[in-house]
Amino acid sequence: MKIPDKNYSGFVMLKLENPCFHELQLEVQNNSPLAFEFETDCHVSIGLFIENICIGDVLRTIWHLIPFGAMIKTDELSSQFMNPDASVVKFSLKNPTLSRLNSICQSFPNKNMHPIYNPHVTFGYLPANTEFKIRLTNPFFVICGVMVSYNDNYENSHTMYIAPDKTFSMSVTDKDGKPVQGSGWEADAFSNLK
C-alpha cells in the first residue's frame, strides 16, 4: 500500500504515556514561551517521509511494539534545529523495533538536511542557548500509545492511535484542528493490522 501522491508528506511518532516524561515536559514548557503545535507534546519521533512509504508495513510493525522498552542516552541536550531562536530538548533511543520503523521511513524530503534521522524522544523547546540540565534513568522502560500522523501538504492531519491494549482509533483534522472525513486508503491500512 503506497501513499498515492508524491507530494504527500508525514511523520511517524509515538505518543508517550509515562508520568516521569510528562513531568519533564511540563518543566520544559514552563521555561519556554515557544509554541510548536504538536511538538509541545512529549513524543518519540521515528522518521520523516515524503513518498514510497508502505503504510501497511508501518502499521504492522507498530502493532507488535506495545509495550516496549527503550534505552535512553542521558544528559544529551540537542540544540541543532532549523529554528535559530529555539533549542529542542531531546534524547536518543535504542530499540530494535524503533530502528525497524526508522528504516521503513528512510525516504526523506531532503537527505542533505536530515542525512541521519535516529529515533529520539522530544520533550519540548526552549529559547536558543538556554542552559537545561536533566538526568534520566537508563534503561528507561516506556509504556506507550502510538500515534501515526500523515500530513497532506500540512492541510489535513491523519492520526491513528493504538492504545496499550491494542485497540485503535482514527481521526482526521484540518490545519485548524477541526475534524474532517478521512480518505479510503486509511480503512485499508487498518484491515491489514493483525
Please tell me what each predicted stretch does.
Residues 1-193:
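Histidine-dependent nucleotide/RNA phosphoesterase domain, centered on the 2H-phosphoesterase fold
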